[in-house]
Amino acid sequence: MKEDNSLYPLKFQPILKEKIWGGTKLKKLFNKQTDSDKIGESWELSGFKGDESVVSNGFLAGNNLTELIEIYMGDLVGDKIFEEFGLTFPLLFKLIDANDDLSIQVHPDDETAALRHNSLGKTEMWYVIDAEPDGELIVGFKNDCSREEYLKALEEERLSDLLKKVPVRKGDVIFIPAGLVHAIKKGVLVAEIQESSDLTYRIYDYKRTDEHGKERELHTELALDVINFSATKNPKVAYEPKVNAVTPLVSCDYFTTNLLLFNRTIIRNYSSLDSFVVYMCLEGNFIIECENHKILVEKGETVLIPASLDEVSLIPNGEVKLLEVFIQ
């Protein structure tokens, strides 16, 4: 029998990151393998230098994402994307468990990031997987604010008074363009989809200290130039989830994200799309069937569908919830 060396849906080994604010939900809910009780992030799919995801299934197991792009180029990521980004995988996918408040922070846009750090900027979105009853996020300012007001509040330890706190529950979606001040608060679990960048300007960190008694570095000056000081109106993305249909969530220059809720087989045809597709499975499990491949996907797994695959069947075992992400 002829060996099939064509591309197929790829699963990856999660890259688990200990954080000062991390917890145990990622191992409890999503079976992430770790002895640590401080896992804040699982980098599900990353081409970020030094943190490249490694394939865990099929004949390509053991190869990392950058090596695959080098070999398969546009067949893996899409011709247009390969032309623009080369060997850089343009997006980063994470699961984040805030067992304590994250620092209040902001990310630079592409232009500033390129100039200062030779990096992509960071526009991102959050899908709230779960939240404790009092779970909230910080998203921008309550009212329009001047640089002077902001600096004074920072100096007087009352920045919190200026910021917009948004109560959240399971299923809420927040879009965070570069420049928007934000933070995940204690008790919130999110899926994060972002540009492939690890640039964070930390504005305030509650005077927390690390194991050596040192406070983490703040980036007050760097942040000042990139902050959007306008009031945040309605930070939540409005959407009506439909079963056995595609529900659009976010569409921006960097990524398009849809919600798929299904309890019967659905067929997704990507023949007109010049992009890879990523599935983040948040609830249930299902089989991806395409060409000569059948791949089981469990809750908490992330899968890369290569751009060369035009059509996939998603066969659920009960109810399934997943995020579908690509670049248009």
Show where each model-derived region lies.
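His/acidic/aromatic-lined binding-pocket segments of jelly-roll/cupin-type domains
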Residues: 93, 102, 124-127, 165-166, ...
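Ligand-binding loop in jelly-roll beta-barrel domains
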Residues: 86-88, 96-101, 110, 131-134, ...
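Short acidic-glycine-tyrosine-enriched beta hairpin
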Residues: 163-175, 291-308
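Short, structured beta-strand/loop micro-motifs enriched in basic residues and often containing a Trp
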Residues: 152-159, 283-287
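Transition-metal
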Residues: 1-145, 205-233, 257
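Short beta-strand segments in beta-sandwich/barrel cores
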Residues: 267-268, 284-289, 302
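An exposed, glycine/acidic-rich loop-and-rim segment of catalytic or binding clefts
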Residues: 156-162, 173-175, 180-232
